[in-house]
């Protein structure tokens, strides 16, 4: 039994859902998202509540039930509130700047890294060492933030690199002399 899959999704004001043969479109104040769901999951929209049902308790249907509900809920939250990931940079000379929709990063390499914003994603640079990635699609926001982090992930000896705000970086002790 999927406990997450059985939860009811309540639609906030201004959000509407259309289900066309398991291709679900969610419209809200921040935008519109469309996603195709598995044919075995039945999506019912009743008033301002959405429920997902599976035809039987086969292993395949159980695994997809909770995931489908979580994906649909993320779509509803995305078009009503949006998602954001905050990153911070640690290191001498590490800085970020915005050039149009492009994020230009100086992270201790011989060249600057440029990251083009994917469709639906916006970058903000509140200070030279912090980056905010925001958008309505949770998956794309997370993937973009992870890509930026991968350009210079935090190293354990000095802690230099790009990390999520609040991320704990395990530190190691350096080599000891004789």
Curated annotation (Swiss-Prot):
Q: What does this protein do?
A: This protein binds to the 23S rRNA, and is important in its secondary structure. It is located near the subunit interface in the base of the L7/L12 stalk, and near the tRNA binding site of the peptidyltransferase center.
Name the InterPro entries on file.
Answer: Ribosomal_uL6-like, Ribosomal_uL6-like_a/b-dom_sf, Ribosomal_uL6_a/b-dom, Ribosomal_uL6_bac-type, Ribosomal_uL6_CS
Q: Give the species.
A: Streptococcus thermophilus (strain ATCC BAA-250 / LMG 18311)
Q: Which family does it belong to?
A: Belongs to the universal ribosomal protein uL6 family.
Keyword Ribosomal protein listed? yes
Which GO molecular function entries does the Swiss-Prot or TrEMBL record give? rRNA binding; structural constituent of ribosome
| Name under which the protein is recorded | Large ribosomal subunit protein uL6
- Cite the Gene3D superfamilies for this sequence: Ribosomal protein L6, alpha-beta domain (3.90.930.12)
Would you tell me the Gene Ontology cellular component terms? cytosolic large ribosomal subunit
């Amino acid at each position: 039994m999927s406990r997450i899959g059985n939860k009811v999704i309540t639609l906030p004001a201004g959000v509407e859902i259309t289900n066309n043969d398991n291709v679900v479109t969610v419209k809200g104040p921040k935008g519109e998202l469309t996603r195709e769901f598995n044919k075995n999951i039945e999506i019912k929209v009743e008033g301002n509540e959405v429920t997902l049902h599976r035809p039987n308790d086969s292993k395949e249907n159980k695994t997809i039930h909770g995931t489908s509900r979580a994906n649909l809920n993320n779509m509803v939250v995305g078009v009503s509130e949006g998602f954001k990931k905050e990153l911070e940079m640690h290191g001498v000379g590490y800085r970020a700047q915005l050039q149009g929709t492009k994020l230009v990063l100086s992270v201790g390499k011989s060249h600057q890294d440029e990251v083009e914003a994917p469709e639906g994603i916006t970058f903000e640079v509140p200070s030279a060492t912090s980056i905010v990635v925001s958008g309505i699609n949770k998956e794309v926001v997370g993937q973009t933030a992870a890509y930026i982090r991968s350009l210079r992930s935090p190293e354990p000896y000095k802690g230099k690199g790009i990390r999520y705000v609040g991320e704990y970086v395990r530190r190691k002790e350096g080599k000891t002399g004789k």
